């Protein structure tokens, strides 16, 4: 009998020094495996849109309305009303969105998970979600957490006398953190030392000015108490959420019409955040040692500010007070910089002591709306036009909470607004007769006879579809915005060549009378793939689903769509210029935005190289003597040990190991598939002697996925 070990068991799965610890620059390919079926308890057959249709929507709203004034002893409601804290919860769920990469936002219920559930700016929002649990429990999977967080904010506003613009459901929960989101490089909460360059220029794609903040420091830059200096940070942060000056003013003032900030005592009284709290805290954090730890003793932001005389009712008090009083810099009980109205009467109600009144108070960033000349103009207009302010806030709130949901076709529920908004990237209704199989076959034959090459057909379809971003559901082939500004002029799309291809395809489209140009572009790409597969000896039909429409220039916000321009697209071996991030990492970033797995990314890169889809006709990575033929030659030749690689003039030269004769040139992206152990393992599958047929079928499957990423009508 084996002797029982006397050694303690000190190791668990996943513990110890990781590969990432040893090699910090290693490709993060695990980011392409996020949110797989293995992490989803609801199973592959679960259809959230169908479940949402079964929801008694107005009964849910009634329950939420009742919750607003059902104060609980364990977390008493300020002013007897939970509305303000639920507005903050919804705001902070949606407010992580940024335009640069479409990541963040409230569309996946990420506020439940680290790091967001433990950000300093989200202090005590964990209590709001716990207050919601009985309602979530009651309605189960017919309402996602992602939808519930936003809907609760809407109901909170309505319960306080505000008329919202509407609400759309359709946000499907995920079950683990979005580890692909880069929140910054700082390792200390509220730090700023690694996100600015030059004259306080915030690095892309970041939007928040501090690690762990949703927006900006409410005490001003570096807690300076300078409201004018705060204007730059405010514009940068809100601007990266696609908000203009009017929307910024409306959101700040509208949000601060309700509730209060909490700073009853120094922050040293706060316990650890949820992710750092002990097991017995059961996911709640920031337990306070000051007084009762809640109610009048609450410590959250460290600021102790109440803006209006009716903190649980919509009013125009914010602007009335902003301009009526003169303000002096003071400190909260926690020592934070804030502003108190000079010589003002005590007109502000205390949140928990009946009859007690306080002087009006403001944040440094509130006063920015008065001292910044452009913000002041808007603020005075809203002061004189309360209805205009209410409408602006309603629209800005709807945009804030729906910006990451993608096109309107994804919206669910009885309160979806009828009005079409430019930021929704609207599409016209379909007006063409639906083509049948014979129509499709006829058009495919004409495309094949058009004189356009495989490379032209494939590159154009890829340029159209690959703008898609899985975060905010923007981009994609539907709309044929490839022919419109700004996309038609993007360097990655080789504008001169693109114009010629589009002209030919548009001629075929108009002659057909049954297809949108968006459909023709995708169909033409499929024709190119089929031709290339046939030349490789594999007969295959690329799936095609008509039904796309063509957007107009008027339906396309040029400034907003500019964020979709690729800085790098490793699938086309395109890189706009040198940067601090190795381009192979940017390939993974692009693949993650396209919701691709590592095998899908691999087969697409290998296929696009041999099909000649590189931007500008570059020959880098075209490891084949048969361009335009869908072979696994990219992988076969990359893994060939008869070739040796050396860096040369910003790229790499592949030379015959014996003769020294140059055979190929490559980028870092190309060589990653031989250098990275995981990618090499995938490449070996296609480079094997039996890899040809599998390669073609896998390429067509991944290609079709990308072409249909924005086809929510097919789901």
From Swiss-Prot:
Catalysed reactions, semicolon-separated: H2O2 + AH2 = A + 2 H2O; 2 H2O2 = O2 + 2 H2O
Cofactor details (free text): Binds 1 heme b (iron(II)-protoporphyrin IX) group per dimer.
Domain of life: Bacteria
The keyword Iron appears for this protein: yes
Signal peptide location: none
Alphabetical list of Gene3D superfamilies matching this protein: 1.10.520.10, Peroxidase, domain 2
Catalytic residues (positions): 92
NCBIfam families registered for this protein in UniProt: cat_per_HPI (TIGR00198), PRK15061.1 (NF011635)
HAMAP family: Catal_peroxid (MF_01961)
Family: Belongs to the peroxidase family. Peroxidase/catalase subfamily.
Protein known as: Catalase-peroxidase
Species of provenance: Methylibium petroleiphilum (strain ATCC BAA-1232 / LMG 22953 / PM1)
């Amino acid at each position: 009998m084996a002797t029982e070990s006397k050694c303690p068991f000190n190791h668990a799965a996943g513990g110890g020094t990781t590969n990432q610890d040893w090699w910090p620059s290693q490709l993060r390919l695990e980011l392409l495996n996020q949110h797989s079926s293995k992490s989803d308890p609801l199973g592959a057959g679960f259809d959230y849109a169908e479940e949402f249709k079964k929801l008694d929507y107005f009964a849910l709203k009634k329950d939420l309305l009742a919750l607003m004034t059902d104060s609980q002893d364990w977390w008493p409601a300020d002013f007897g009303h939970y509305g303000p804290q639920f507005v903050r919860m919804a705001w902070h769920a949606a407010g992580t969105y940024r335009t640069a990469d479409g990541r963040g936002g409230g569309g996946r219920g990420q506020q439940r998970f680290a790091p967001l559930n433990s950000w300093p700016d989200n202090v005590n929002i964990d209590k709001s979600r716990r207050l919601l649990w009985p309602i979530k429990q009651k309605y189960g999977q017919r309402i996602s957490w992602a939808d519930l967080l936003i809907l609760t904010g809407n109901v909170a506003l309505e319960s306080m006398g505000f008329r919202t613009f509407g609400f759309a459901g359709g946000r499907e929960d995920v079950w683990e953190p979005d580890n692909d989101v880069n929140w910054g490089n700082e390792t200390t909460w509220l730090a700023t030392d690694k996100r600015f360059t030059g004259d306080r220029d915030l690095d892309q794609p970041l939007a928040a000015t501090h690690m762990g903040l949703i927006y900006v420091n409410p005490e001003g830059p570096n807690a300076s108490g300078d409201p004018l200096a705060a204007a730059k940070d405010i514009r940068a942060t809100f601007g990266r959420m696609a908000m203009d000056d009017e929307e910024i003013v409306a959101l700040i003032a509208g949000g601060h019409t309700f509730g209060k900030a909490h700073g009853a005592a120094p922050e040293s009284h706060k316990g650890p955040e949820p992710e750092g709290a002990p097991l017995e805290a059961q996911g709640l954090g920031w337990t306070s040692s000051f007084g009762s730890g809640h109610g009048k003793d609450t410590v959250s932001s460290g600021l102790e500010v109440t803006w209006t005389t009716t903190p649980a009712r919509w009013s125009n008090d914010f602007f009335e007070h902003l301009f009526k009083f003169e303000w002096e810099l003071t400190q909260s009980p926690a020592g934070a910089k804030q502003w108190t109205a000079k010589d003002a009467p005590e007109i502000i109600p205390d949140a928990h002591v009946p009859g007690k009144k306080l002087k009006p108070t403001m944040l440094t960033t509130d006063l920015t709306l008065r001292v910044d000349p452009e913000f002041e103009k808007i603020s005075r207009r809203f002061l004189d036009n309360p209805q205009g302010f209410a409408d602006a806030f309603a629209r800005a709130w709807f945009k804030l909470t729906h910006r990451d949901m993608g096109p309107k076709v994804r919206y669910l529920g009885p309160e979806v607004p009828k009005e079409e908004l430019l930021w929704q990237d609207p599409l016209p209704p379909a007006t063409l007769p639906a083509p049948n199989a014979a129509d499709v076959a006829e058009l495919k034959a004409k495309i094949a006879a058009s004189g356009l090459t495989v490379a032209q057909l494939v590159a154009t379809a890829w340029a159209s579809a690959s703008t898609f971003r899985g975060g905010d559901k923007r981009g994609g082939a539907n709309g044929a915005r490839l022919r419109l500004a700004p996309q038609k002029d993007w360097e990655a799309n080789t504008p001169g060549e693109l114009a010629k291809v589009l002209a030919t395809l548009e001629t075929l489209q108009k002659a057909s009378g049954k297809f949108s140009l968006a459909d023709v572009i995708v169909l033409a790409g499929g024709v190119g793939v089929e031709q290339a597969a046939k030349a490789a000896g594999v007969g295959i039909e690329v799936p095609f689903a008509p039904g796309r429409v063509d957007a107009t220039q008027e339906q396309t916000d040029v400034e907003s769509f500019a964020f979709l321009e690729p800085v790098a697209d490793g699938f086309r071996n395109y890189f706009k210029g040198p940067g601090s991030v190795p381009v192979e990492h940017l390939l993974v970033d692009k693949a993650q935005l396209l919701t691709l797995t590592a095998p899908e990314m691999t087969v697409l890169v290998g296929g696009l190289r041999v099909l000649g889809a590189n931007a500008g006709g570059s020959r880098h990575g075209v490891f084949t003597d048969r361009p335009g033929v869908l072979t696994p030659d990219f992988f076969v030749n990359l893994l060939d040990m008869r070739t040796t690689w050396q860096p040369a003039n910003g790229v790499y030269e592949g030379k015959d190991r014996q003769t020294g004769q140059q055979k190929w040139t490559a980028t870092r992206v190309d060589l990653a598939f031989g250098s990275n152990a995981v990618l090499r393992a995938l490449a070996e599958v296609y480079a094997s002697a039996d890899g040809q047929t599998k390669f073609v079928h896998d390429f067509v499957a991944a290609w079709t996925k990308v072409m249909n990423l924005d086809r929510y009508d097919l789901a």
